[in-house]
Amino acid sequence: MNLEVTILSNLCYHEKYARKVLPFLMKEYFTTREYKIVFLEIHEYISQYDALPSLNALSIECQERTDLTEDQFKTIKEVLSELSNEKSEYNWLVDTTEKWCQERAIYLSLMESVTVSYTHLRAH
């Protein structure tokens, strides 16, 4: 199980963790479109219902999206099937998530800077 799946799993199964880290997570931090969509659905569910979503609820919400192809929905179902209620030590999980958020934010900022620099150089 990779870290992104661990984060998504714990957002679904561990309320204390979800309440602690959700305000700091951004969809841009996730590396695939499918992970981003699952994260967005989890975030939206928690925001709307003030409760953790079940995997069934997430599956239904994803199925109702109109911006997914059949293959993308199939991949999202595979991601959902990877989510588990495996216990992780809370402090380790929060620290690891915080570090991951910082690393992803730095990486995305660097990539944006490179893109801006490259665009600027090409314009001149």
Question: Where does each model-flagged region fall?
Answer:
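Conserved small/polar residues in nucleotide/adenosyl-binding loops
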Residues: T119-H124
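Generic hydrophobic alpha-helical segments
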Residues: I42, S113-V114
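Noncatalytic partner-interaction/assembly domains of nucleic-acid and motor enzyme complexes
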Residues: M1-W100
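Hydrophobic side-chain positions on well-ordered alpha-helices
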Residues: Y45, V116-S117
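A short N-terminal interaction module
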Residues: A105-M111, Y118
